[in-house]
Amino acid sequence: MFKRSSGVLAHVTSLPSPHGVGTMGRTACEFIDFLADAHQTYWQVLPLGHTGFGDSPYQCFSAAAGNPYLIDMDLLVEYGLLTADEVRSGDFNASPDVADFEQLADTRWPLFRKAYSRVTPEMKAAIADFTEENREWLPDYALFMALKEEKYHHAPVYMWPEKDVRDRRPEALARVTEELRGEIDFRIFLQYICLLYTSDAADE
């Protein structure tokens, strides 16, 4: 027989946070401790992928990529990539009990780019190893996001004007990869950070 047990279904973004949405960093670890104290066995978190329009966890760009909005901004301070004042400047005085994805999109990405500009040589080496370990999906994902968000301004794939890119012609992909190298590396960095926060929460 199975032992009777119970748990909670809640997406990570629903956790209270001073930074717009709950994250897989400190807020998730505190919630896990709360569940343990309440003698709960399970936390069903729902998908944690990189969401698109509407921010639905069931409409993601990748089955493997994490959602950058779930990065704990305080952890970026601990890693030395942002200052506490910079993180506070990105807050929008919203209630910690309300998720506002539109304002989050306006405030979070400039901070992510600032953090990326401060990556250390040691972290670059770790990111290179991470990229190699995830070569089956990460480079394609990062290229796709750079194309969609930067080159084609969030247009759906069928509206991309360059047919050879839409059709994934090798010479076209090589061209846009070179053109968007900085944007691709930025998105790989975000996925590396996503791995760090996921590992921290899993250790709980």
What are the roles of these predicted feature ranges?
Residues 83-196:
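Active-site-proximal, well-structured secondary-structure segments within enzyme catalytic domains
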Residues 35, 45, 144:
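Conserved, mostly hydrophobic/aromatic
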Residues 44-54:
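Short, solvent-exposed turn/loop segments enriched in Gly/Ser/Thr/Pro and often Arg
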Residues 60-82:
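Acidic, His- and aromatic-enriched active-site or binding-groove loops in soluble protein domains
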Residues 1-19, 173:
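N-terminal small/glycine-rich loop or linker at the start of catalytic domains
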Residues 197-202:
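Conserved small/polar residues in nucleotide/adenosyl-binding loops
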Residues 24-32:
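Short, acidic/polar
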